Amino acid sequence: MKDSFLFTSESVTEGHPDKMADQISDAVLDYIIERDQKAKVACETLVSNGFCMITGELKTSVYAPMQEIAREVVKKIGYTDALYGFDYRSAAVLNGVGEQSPDINQGVDREDGEIGAGDQGLMFGYACKETETLMPLPIHLAHQLTFALAQKRKDNTLPFLRPDGKSQVSVRYENNKPVSIDTIVISTQHSPEVSQKHLKEAVIEEIVYKVLSKEYLHDNIKFFVNPTGKFVIGGPQGDAGLTGRKIIVDTYGGSCPHGGGAFSGKDPSKVDRSAAYAARYVAKNLVASGVCDKATVQLAYAIGVIEPVSIYVNTHNTSKYSSAELEKCVKSVFKLTPKGIIESLDLLRPIYSLTSAYGHFGRELEEFTWEKTNKAEEIKAFFKR
């Protein structure tokens, strides 16, 4: 008897209010880190009806023009008219950023050149063989749909689309392997002139069938396109947006646990971000090496402490090696101190705006060093000793 179940993940477009906030926070981080690699940045953003507020804590010698940075991000996303729910020209931008607490900084910057963790916390990484990029299929498909919504809007293929939007994909699994798409939900902001019928047909034909792999498509997929019937009011006019509210979209779509820490606006001394990237790097290389088909990796840190307080590897019964053996391998092959992570993944670069929409993982861009599988051979060699 087949073990059959559905698993669902969602994604949001770059014009979703929470993603707007993430992108502004990461644009501020990129501006500062490009000019001051020793900077400590924790930038939070709120967007609401007609205004944006940037807050958080900094330790840097760099002046960051917050208004200009925020307006440029919003313009690039496509909020160029108040009718869309936000206008980069007329929106108020408020700056409430303060200085980083010296109590925190004394535990991070060490006289010996090492870096203590910027906070306590636990971070997870995950990899599996469901896609070529070793990501779970549901979140992979959901990101493909939201990215296509933005691209078809920007290239004027579907000129009635507006920036805000979401997708959700339910995938059927049999014996723990994905076999087909069961349900697709797409909610997209649109101009008031377009009919619901035309919108649904265009989205299915131009986005779903032209973007998703035919391997998982079939005639009986259930489609829900703007199921409420209308989505004209969107962006920050429809909902307020905050940095760090799309942590499952940013990671694995719910396929593995999440430690709770958000990424955007945080420099890599914050292990919420850098150690989550490292955990993905570890998990992906374990799977790529062939020692397992699936891996969940947990790292945990204490504020001001250099080494992780714990490392845990779960291969979900897909490896002949025990968790203890795999953890010993991870400690041997990977540098998992904050400094080791920053140096091995080259994280002191202005790369973070690229991460702030459509997922931090599974996108094999040159800048995303945590997606490389250059440790796979070392892992193989470890188990041949």
UniProtKB/Swiss-Prot annotation:
GO terms for biological process: one-carbon metabolic process; S-adenosylmethionine biosynthetic process. Its cofactor is Mg(2+); K(+). Its EC number is 2.5.1.6. Pfam families: S-AdoMet_synt_C (PF02773), S-AdoMet_synt_M (PF02772), S-AdoMet_synt_N (PF00438). ATP binds at residues 16, 164-166, 230-231, 239, 245-246, 262, 266. Mg(2+) binds at residue 18. It is found in: Cytoplasm. It catalyses: L-methionine + ATP + H2O = S-adenosyl-L-methionine + phosphate + diphosphate. Pathway: Amino-acid biosynthesis; S-adenosyl-L-methionine biosynthesis; S-adenosyl-L-methionine from L-methionine: step 1/1. Belongs to the AdoMet synthase family. Catalyzes the formation of S-adenosylmethionine (AdoMet) from methionine and ATP. The overall synthetic reaction is composed of two sequential steps, AdoMet formation and the subsequent tripolyphosphate hydrolysis which occurs prior to release of AdoMet from the enzyme. This is S-adenosylmethionine synthase.
